[in-house]
């Protein structure tokens, strides 16, 4: 019988329940989500284009005359409808995902001035993608539930036995193309994010999985 591969490694700080966790687990979760939010903020400040899901929100807003915030909310709701057949459940991490990322995204864009030189903007964008990927990988290893879109990624990986890299990249590129066709604005940063974030998340998951104290199934 073929050995099952874990999509997300079971770490020493992983929660045993979606709604209860030790102080260490919560601390790591909050740290990871804050890093993710800062990374998102740096991408926004770079001015090189929004993330693919934001491009889709823009496109839907243009086609429906909805506010972009409402479009984003409706997308999240639509994505979570797919959770049930993928056997995904809400957890504490799902709720904190929404709150903490938005908080640190706002803080980052308020305290840092957007760069003007193209080189500096590229640096902001690249560092933002790395932080976004690291934060995503780290918070998922807490096993307290994923955000709506990350949950979709994990669910597809588990259902079809695919890697995070393949699924995340496919989702981001597909969403980017759909958003563009609907009228959303695609920039260099959007393309960089869509084509690299899957590899970045997979890279950090592989590093975490190979820490000596973490049992990991290959």
Curated annotation (Swiss-Prot):
Keywords: Cell membrane, Membrane, Transmembrane, Transmembrane helix. GO terms for cellular component: plasma membrane. The keyword Ribonucleoprotein does not apply. It is a multi-pass membrane protein. It is found in: Cell membrane. Disulfide bonds: none annotated. The chain crosses the membrane at residues 28-48, 66-86, 92-112, 122-142, 173-193. The keyword Membrane applies. InterPro entries: YczE/YyaS-like. PANTHER family: INTEGRAL MEMBRANE PROTEIN, INTEGRAL MEMBRANE PROTEIN-RELATED. This is Uncharacterized protein HI_0522.
